[in-house]
Amino acid sequence: MSEEEWDAVIAVHLKGHFTVYRHAMAIMRKQESGGSILGITSGAFTASTAQPNYSAAKGGIVSLTRSAAMTAASISLRGGPAINANCLAPTARTRMSDNVPFAFETGDPEDIAPMAIYLLSDQGRDVNAQIYSVVGRRISVWNQPREIRTMYSPDEAWTPEEIASMLPNTIKQEPNPFIDDLERRMKEMEAGDKSGD
């Protein structure tokens, strides 16, 4: 991937969301009536081996939305208008993805509209800093990032050797379902290649 390809995708997706968020937040504060900001971030959690620029941009939109939600909350807590910021992470078949094999469930683009309308309506006004997936008839909420396990250095500062000794038996690693699925599919392809010989 060239630097130009990287920059183009980041500019369209991440900078595009930033530009909308910045102007929308300023208008909502000025008119004192509040409102809702909605980011679209399909691909943020299903990292792509072929398009790291797209995955990075979409992951950046998640962080940008969380930052906008925190800013909106601080405005509201200081007596300003109620503004919220959320993301939709849809998985739907489009013309761009029709020929791409999906390992996961997919829906249709029109399945996403009711959730978007809800989040942008007065009924969704109390929903803030959330990431929702919409796939067909299923709607899911993603967890908020937080520390889940901690370890402490027995001395003043960590050494690489202490980390190597302690990490596997204390905080360990979190399983990654997408890498697990990739490994499974690669084994299936390899088995299929061998059976075809």
Locations of regions flagged by a protein language model:
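A short, exposed helix-loop element centered on a Lys and neighboring polar residues
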Residues: 21-22, 66
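A short helix-coil junction within the Rossmann-fold of NAD(P)-dependent oxidoreductases
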Residues: 23-33, 75, 122
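Catalytic loop of short-chain dehydrogenase/reductase
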Residues: 29, 36-74, 78, 89-105
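C-terminal helical subdomain
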Residues: 104-194
